[in-house]
Design a protein with these regions (language model features):
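Core of compact, soluble alpha-helical bundle domains
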Residues: 1-123
Length: 123
């Protein structure tokens, strides 16, 4: 049986493993590495704080994630792949209530971003 997401080290493992997958993905990697030219040493700690805030209520993340995504050349297919990779990463590493919550939160974030980008209608 896998363990649930319980510690900051678990958040780091989740984020690092997920973005390793993103960097190997033929659809998502160009968005992050070619278009956005993400500085991973800067970006990953932000993502650790973001998911710590989302899952643990740590309030470590201070920011507005949506505006940074506005200029990205993404469509529904990108969001579907992002969710698929995130969900697979969670399934590979964790199970339990907090892992389930992470899947639900990620799906909700993706849905809101797609609505705000005009990729889907409100439902």
């Amino acid at each position: 049986m896998k363990k649930d997401i319980e510690t900051e080290a678990d958040i780091k493992l989740l984020v690092d493993t997920f973005y390793d997958s993103v960097n190997q993905d033929e659809l998502l990697s160009p968005v992050f590495n070619d278009f956005a030219q993400v500085d991973w040493q800067h970006h990953l700690p932000i993502m650790y704080r973001f998911w710590s805030t989302v899952l643990f209520g740590s309030m470590a993340y201070k920011g507005q994630p949506f505006p940074k995504h506005l200029p990205l050349p993404v469509d529904r297919q990108h969001f579907s792949r992002w969710i698929a990779l995130f969900t697979q990463t969670l399934a590979d590493l964790f199970e339990g209530p907090r892992a389930t919550e992470a899947k639900q939160k990620a799906a909700g974030i993706a849905h809101i971003f797609q609505m705000r980008l005009g990729l889907i209608g409100q439902s």
